[in-house]
């Protein structure tokens, strides 16, 4: 009976271990493929700290994290664009980009398209520069929190002070 328990426990471990391989997110395998292609597993990659992880650890509030994440995703989209003609890593980049779309953009295609359009604007294009400066005041107004609409309450001490002096 004792050996039967060991055999059953071993079989359970094998089954659970194999399920773990199939349940893994698809981007993990593709990220490993990109690591091999870019030799990103080498020890010298860790020199001088991380690019993004320390920044993400610093910011805990959801709004702050979204700002940082948007810049990081923008970087990855530009990186993938530079290697779009490389057939050996094309599938990996597409899989990861699709997963980013699901996780960051909530599968909202329009949101992703607008994001990519923003990241593709060239800062060196004179027409883009002129339009950006033309829209600057409105963009700055959008950055400010909306004013709270409502009546302001006057301090009761003002009225009490006047009554006392009269």
From Swiss-Prot:
Keyword match Hydrolase: no
GO terms classed as biological process: adaptive immune response; defense response to virus; humoral immune response; positive regulation of autophagy
InterPro entries, sorted: 4_helix_cytokine-like_core (IPR009079), Interferon_gamma (IPR002069)
Modified residue annotations for Pyrrolidone carboxylic acid: 24
Cited Gene3D superfamilies: 1.20.1250.10
Positions bearing carbohydrate: 48, 86, 120
Pfam name, any one: IFN-gamma
Keywords: Antiviral defense, Cytokine, Glycoprotein, Growth regulation, Pyrrolidone carboxylic acid, Secreted, Signal
MF (Gene Ontology): cytokine activity; type II interferon receptor binding
CC terms in the record's Gene Ontology section: extracellular space
Major place of residence: secreted
Localisation per UniProt entry: Secreted
Taxonomic superkingdom: Eukaryota
SUPFAM superfamilies linked: 4-helical cytokines
Signal peptide: 1-23
Tissues and organs where the protein is expressed, per its UniProt entry: Released primarily from activated T lymphocytes.
Role according to the record: Type II interferon produced by immune cells such as T-cells and NK cells that plays crucial roles in antimicrobial, antiviral, and antitumor responses by activating effector immune cells and enhancing antigen presentation. Primarily signals through the JAK-STAT pathway after interaction with its receptor IFNGR1 to affect gene regulation. Upon IFNG binding, IFNGR1 intracellular domain opens out to allow association of downstream signaling components JAK2, JAK1 and STAT1, leading to STAT1 activation, nuclear translocation and transcription of IFNG-regulated genes.
Record-stated family: Belongs to the type II (or gamma) interferon family.
Record's subunit section: Homodimer. Interacts with IFNGR1 (via extracellular domain); this interaction promotes IFNGR1 dimerization.
Protein name per its UniProtKB record: Interferon gamma
Source organism (scientific name): Callithrix jacchus (White-tufted-ear marmoset)
């Amino acid at each position: 009976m004792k050996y039967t328990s060991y055999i059953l426990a071993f079989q359970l471990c094998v089954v659970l271990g194999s399920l773990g391989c199939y349940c893994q997110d698809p981007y993990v395998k593709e990220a490993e493929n990109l690591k091999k292609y870019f030799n990103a597993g080498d020890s010298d990659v860790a020199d001088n700290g991380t690019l993004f992880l320390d920044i993400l650890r610093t910011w805990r509030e959801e709004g702050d994290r979204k700002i940082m994440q948007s810049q990081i995703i923008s970087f990855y989209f530009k990186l993938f664009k530079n290697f779009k003609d490389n057939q050996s890593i094309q599938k990996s980049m597409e899989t990861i980009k699709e997963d980013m779309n699901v996780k960051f953009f909530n599968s909202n295609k329009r949101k992703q398209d607008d994001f990519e359009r923003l990241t593709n604007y060239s800062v060196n294009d004179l027409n883009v520069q002129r339009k950006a400066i033309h829209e600057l005041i409105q963009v700055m107004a959008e950055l400010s929190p909306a004013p709270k609409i409502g009546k302001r309450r006057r301090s009761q001490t003002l009225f009490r002070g006047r009554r006392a002096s009269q």
